[in-house]
Amino acid sequence: MNTSQDVNAEAANERSALLPRFLGSHRGNVPENTDTYALTPLFYWIRSTSVGLLLITIICHLFLLLNIFISIPIISHLSPGFMPVGFTALAAILLAMQIMFVYSPNAPERVTQRIICFLLAIDVLVVFLSPILRHREGWRSNAFVLWAFLMSLWIVITDLMLFRQYKEEHPDYDAIAHRGYYWSWSPSTWPWRQVGSLTASTILSVILTILTIHTLVTLIMRAYDGALSAPGQLYTVTDSKARVHLECFGSSSSNNKTTVLVEGGEVSVHPFKEWLLNLQHTSPDLYEESKDFEGYENDVKPYLSPDTRVCVWDRPGMGWSDNIGSPSSVGIVMDLLTEALAQADVSGPYVLVAHGIGGVYSNVFAARHLSEVKGIVFVDAGSVQTLKDSGQFLSRFLLFVRGWLSPLGINRIFGSIFMGKTRQDRVYGMYSWTSDRWVKSKIEESLTGPSFSRYELQSAQSVLPKDLPVSVISAGKSMKRFKKWPDEQRQLSKLTQRTVWDIVNNAPHDVWLSDDGGDLIMKRLGEIIYGGWPN
């Protein structure tokens, strides 16, 4: 019966190596039938080329990381920037694994290499066939997905080249492998190092395959979510081709010319809009009966007239709006809103309704449109302290980590499978924080908040007319939960001499979700629109 020793003892021929052909061999301590590739000129050429490709990939990755914080021409400024970062990281890991484990390729690694290459090919098709991904990412961002695929294809092809050379140098490979002697090594030459390398490369290859599956599913979900039609209109602003979403409803030809302009908070404005839309569409009978409502005072209607024009918009990165270049301050964002309103032919007077961080934006907007703003309603809104806190190092770091991991879509996939979240939830609902566009917008706020945006806000607050009606409505739960929140609300209550501060006990941050909070918002809004504001 043949043994591995018998195989190793076969007579030498013209193909036999005179010296051991791999690193670390000493006087025949390693069997001839090793699965290590010979260190031929082809091997060295492939290795040096892979090292060069790895260096190029790492340099691109570093530039892409810089682009998240400061826009550079390397990719489209409409892109959140995290997708190319993720795919260059994946390409770098693939090349690093090839360089580390090229001495001892194995069957599991070869299988996963081909699976990853196939998955990346599908990724390329998705990003180039999806209209929304082509628009938001641009061809330069999508090119990095193609780069990751080409690096994976390079690894597969070079492995085939080396494997073919190996089989030429070992004509008995197929027979040995078929009889099962290829792995039969004597205890005296047991390759513990090689077993460890085999295990590590197999585990890493499986992990990379899973991560590549995640990137594919995430791209498909992004393309699917992006196909959701936007209510209202998308307006192209500035020369950047960025599109912002603006929706107006109600009559623009009614006797009441006031426009209610709603600014969202930490997520898209649409959860707030849906509540306001229901009230704005209140039947005329209920509208007339509202005069008998308990909170009716001084002929003030607690519901909006059905013909009142209400406009809502999504800030860059929220809802259907594109991201813009970095850095962007509150003032820059408000310039985009002004341009969108001009294109939509929506003029004042305005009554501003702002929720959460949106209070900062509405404050700056009011200062830039002093003659057109009729009043402001702050709904548990932030101010200067909110901008200061947004620049904390831990907050920035966690946002960056979330963005760096966003191409994997862990939260998106988890929410869709286990929590039943729909694309409506991911685009404009409370689950929109899982979007890489949302993360990019929050990074923008954290970068400029403590500096540029804070100075813009302080300047805006100093020029507001002292007789401007301002309503500050604070959530009781927020007042109890956050230590600095009462002081910030007190600061807002001193904006003008006609500021009224209300605290809704036991109301959440989304004040309108409570009955008392919703009634109070409409009461204050009606007082500003129809008259009756306290002097």
UniProtKB/Swiss-Prot annotation:
Keyword Oxidoreductase: no
Key words, A-Z: Membrane, Transmembrane, Transmembrane helix
Cell compartments where the protein resides: Membrane
Superkingdom of the source species: Eukaryota
Entries under Gene3D superfamilies matching the protein: alpha/beta hydrolase
SUPFAM superfamilies attached to this UniProt entry: alpha/beta-Hydrolases
Membrane topology: Multi-pass membrane protein
MF-aspect GO terms: hydrolase activity
Coiled coil: none
Regions that span the bilayer: 55-75, 82-102, 115-135, 143-163, 201-221, 346-366
Pfam family name, one: DUF2417
InterPro entries for this protein: AB_hydrolase_1, AB_hydrolase_fold, DUF2417
Main location: membrane
A GO term from the CC aspect: cytoplasm
Protein name as it appears in the record: Uncharacterized protein C23C11.06c
Organism (species): Schizosaccharomyces pombe (strain 972 / ATCC 24843) (Fission yeast)
